[in-house]
Amino acid sequence: MIKLDIKDAKKFLKTNVFSLQDQVNELHDVIQNKSGLGNDFLGWLDLPLTYDKEELDRIYKLKEQHKNVDAIVVIGIGGSYLGAKAGYEFLKTPFKKQKPELIFAGHHLSANYLKHLLKYLNKKNYVINVISKSGTTTEPAVAFRLLKAHIENKYGVKEARKRIFATTDKARGSLYQLAINEGYERFVIEDNVGGRFSVLSAVGLLPFVFVGIDVEKMIKGAQDAYHDAQDPSLKKNKAYLYAVTRFLLNQSGKDVEYLINYEPRLAFFAEWWKQLFGESEGKGGKGLLVHSASFTTDLHSLGQQIQDGNRIIFETVLNVKKTDKLSIPFVEEDLDKLNYIAGKEISYVNEQAFLGTKEAHIDGGVPNIVITIDKMDAYHFGYLVYFFEIACAMSAYLLEVNPFDQPGVEAYKKNMFRLLGKK
């Protein structure tokens, strides 16, 4: 469960949030009946209930077969990478050596990164999970070509085939064909599930299982979020209330939304969130510009601009109620003048920083939406994923755009291919 507080956003709105209830009711029916724009990509809608249990069992068995590996290299970009990365960072213990280690590749074209990754893997016992619906997306295809050669040279072609798992289309595409030809273990990206909505499919579940994340709890969180989203009432449906509030803030002249966190482990969740909303809404000259910031760190860089810059910003704060306990010690000399908070929990100081910042930003004309979760665990990760997915669908439909395509992404690819001389 989560808490949603919009009281520090409502005062900036020109329209009462509840005045959109009839429109929300209509759009809720459009979503549930799968009759709106992009309706052939609504497979994620029921995924918490209809996920492939047999496929998940195969993932568990695969993990058991490779229980002694040092690392799993996940190759993917965009939705084929960000969800797994977000969950891994959300749930891992800082500085704890993870076995197997989760390594990502194919999410950029850095020769420096790939060269040193290959060198690093020379001494690692590893497996590969390549994720791509088509198999021809440039960044992961380049990385896979290099890593496929590396793992075959390291273990031999026959053994390498047992160590490469393909998450791809169920019936077509170059990666599908390669997986068939080579005999790789295959997992499915369904046609009706777009990449940024695929976290709760094999795209995210396979990496999560391999690093020991409790995916059953994650799915339970998503199921609860699903059930909480069945009633369209804005007095009950927090995801829709969030969608309406951000829509009306946009209508009131706020063009930029920052997702704010006070826990570093949430930084990559924000990266997933930015893709979710940026690709879903940013089309036809519409959509909020989505940014993220990690406080208090970014208060010493972006804080000035947020506090005193162009008044086109609002903040959605992702707040965590329970964190680790660690007290500030008393020091006799008190040269740093911190004894006034000696004995206090650092989490308490962090909370006061949050409250003080919120007050300052509101006074400075920056609306605040606050989403509070009890703690950072698999359940709450799953809940938040579905919460934001369904909120995103509602938000995009309020804008009258298709939430599930991304035509603008092709522009850079066409230019790059032309410059590279692709025929």
Swiss-Prot record:
| Gene name of this polypeptide | pgi
Residues annotated as catalytic? E279 (proton donor), H300, K413
Record keywords: Cytoplasm, Gluconeogenesis, Glycolysis, Isomerase
Q: Which NCBIfam families match?
A: PRK14097.1 (NF010697)
Which organism's genome codes for this protein? Acholeplasma laidlawii (strain PG-8A)
Any one Gene Ontology molecular-function term assigned to this protein's record? glucose-6-phosphate isomerase activity
The record ties this protein, via PROSITE patterns, to:
P_GLUCOSE_ISOMERASE_1, P_GLUCOSE_ISOMERASE_2, P_GLUCOSE_ISOMERASE_3
- Fetch the InterPro entries from UniProt: G6P_Isomerase, Phosphoglucose_isomerase_CS, SIS_dom_sf, SIS_PGI_1, SIS_PGI_2
Q: Please report which protein family the annotation says this sequence is part of.
A: Belongs to the GPI family.
Q: What enzyme category does the UniProt record give? A: isomerase
Q: Name one GO biological process term.
A: gluconeogenesis
Function in brief: Catalyzes the reversible isomerization of glucose-6-phosphate to fructose-6-phosphate.
- Identify the PANTHER family for this entry: GLUCOSE-6-PHOSPHATE ISOMERASE
Might you give the EC number(s) for this enzyme? 5.3.1.9
Q: What is this protein called?
A: Glucose-6-phosphate isomerase
Q: Which domain of life is it from?
A: Bacteria
Task: Give the residues annotated as coiled coil.
Answer: none
List cellular component terms (GO): cytosol
Q: Where located?
A: Cytoplasm
Is Endoplasmic reticulum found in the keyword set? no
**Listed transmembrane segments:** none
Catalysed reaction per UniProt?
alpha-D-glucose 6-phosphate = beta-D-fructose 6-phosphate
The protein's annotated pathway:
Carbohydrate biosynthesis; gluconeogenesis; Carbohydrate degradation; glycolysis; D-glyceraldehyde 3-phosphate and glycerone phosphate from D-glucose: step 2/4
